[in-house]
């Protein structure tokens, strides 16, 4: 291999471009411009130092890894184990050269190992990256024996060496990674062993594009420190699992004094500044763990099993990420991508044992670009939680690699509760659709599941709502914490208990709702049936009963693409329910009556949602209540604080009501309850409880439901009619809580507030509304 002078090569161009673009990167001219003469001995290296072997295949594999592992590939670029690569050139040369070419970090000067095949030396372009600290880093970096080789024949090497003497030590053996980007080091370390290489090879190509495009966050001080310390700990305790190392590192870091941490803090700041200069428009987007991990890790499934003895919790526990701070979670994968990612994918697989489980997860974009933007600010934990919310419990567990810093079990608990992923839900809902007839009895059990799912994560959950036409609307439900007061209940998507169960229970609950709606007085009996299932279910039932039509919405939900009735934003959910309910056979209401059990299921669904929404602004609740007081949905709409047209304008939470415009507008649907809102959402657990008790007197139930802040409706409002008052109370409740199927809680039989009716609005309206909803959702997602 003659050193070719292809400075013209894209790679070389890249390096030149980098040097121009990032003058701060101090590449030694020898590196980028060294002529073949510099490397004549290294046939493998191009004059620019780029490895001749740098071929697409090589680069592809390498890139994939590189992109995945570290925010600044350049850091890790210095050396990639040649053994892993088929290319003989690769073997000959340190891979660093090509890394910078694809690496997001232009900073990486093309550091080309100058040595012969043996030269594993990393002369590393990272030196500039490291900046002032670079010298020491270089020293460490170059201290590898191979590094010495690098220096051997090339003047360029001397530049690097000038920073520090090059010692013969295998680059790999050295834990320069502490100095270099942690992710890079972790990456190198992981891939250093052949198995790791093998692991990545299969998955590498799959996730290559994703990983390549991914810009890693700059390491924080802990990561910078942990990079170095982890290597030391690993050498001292070779038998320890990465998760244990992470725990030890976390404790050790916490025990460090500010003085001890200062150098790492400074280095982290320096890296951050560099990162900012390189990626001025960089915006942190939490990794779509489920998707990418699933894809990337599946090939390495064997590793997954290894890394996570217990797929659900083991993965998260063991994730070395634990050691790394949440910030590291995105990049921490570098430390144990195998553990965590494999765990994640494994968990996902396990968690989503449901028919579509595996393929479904990737399908449902946990975070659509917009959703990512929505919570790009969320810290890793939040993102993980949101993922968890969307993912099956197992997934959640894996998702919580961040758990390393945090109590994984805690995260898992939080996240696992809404285990059903949206995709799973949609899939299950479809199944439920088919099974729904058979599931009348199941619905109770399902409702129980709903209970487990009921814990509504405070953490943001991104919800992919399948709008009509199979569109995915992804809104990330930011946790209450995230949204704060601004979107109290809207973003909590009603979480259906389980996919199939959810849909089935939804339908059942809907039917139950219809029963109640049709026979408000029958509510007591209905509630009696539901109560056994659970307070939640009874609560839901009463709600559902109140809005018999609601049952339709629920059915629609379960039956329709509407993916996660539970996951959708409350209002989105409502809207979708409404639309789907239109699709549903309205006549089903009679059937719904039969399905008392389903009532309980819906109740559970409602319960799922904690009554986080109770805090919904009272004024809004009152407004809704007042709107509800009017017998007709139309009046409700007119009274809505936000005109129906302003759907897009007001947050999703409110969006539903306007969509419920006049029943007259829908014409086809009675739209008893102007708002399909999730009147008695699970948010009101108290309501759920009281409802069962009060179900006989619907108004009592409703009142109890309204007991939550949404209860703000004045007595005179209740006067309108028990059902009306109840419905309005529930309605405003629903604002607060995203009860999945509960939307039609408003009993408003006389009042005509029946949510179900609204749901029944004609499909055409549904379609129109959906577009509006989508617009509103998008607005909300992006704005948030």
From Swiss-Prot:
Its main location: nucleus. SUPFAM superfamilies: HMG-box (SSF47095). Pfam families: HMG_box. Residues 282-293 have a biased composition (Basic residues). GO terms for cellular component: nucleus. Residues 409-421 have a biased composition (Low complexity). Residues 306-321, 329-355, 367-376, 688-719 have a biased composition (Polar residues). GO terms for biological process: cell differentiation; chaeta development; negative regulation of apoptotic process; negative regulation of cell population proliferation; negative regulation of DNA-templated transcription; negative regulation of transcription by RNA polymerase II; positive regulation of transcription by RNA polymerase II; wing disc development. It comes from the Eukaryota. The keyword Nucleus applies. Residues 278-376, 407-448, 686-719 are annotated as: Disordered. GO terms for molecular function: DNA-binding transcription activator activity, RNA polymerase II-specific; RNA polymerase II cis-regulatory region sequence-specific DNA binding. Residues 426-439 have a biased composition (Basic and acidic residues). Keywords: DNA-binding, Nucleus, Transcription, Transcription regulation. Residues 215-283 bind DNA. It is found in: Nucleus. This is Putative transcription factor SOX-15. The gene is Sox15.
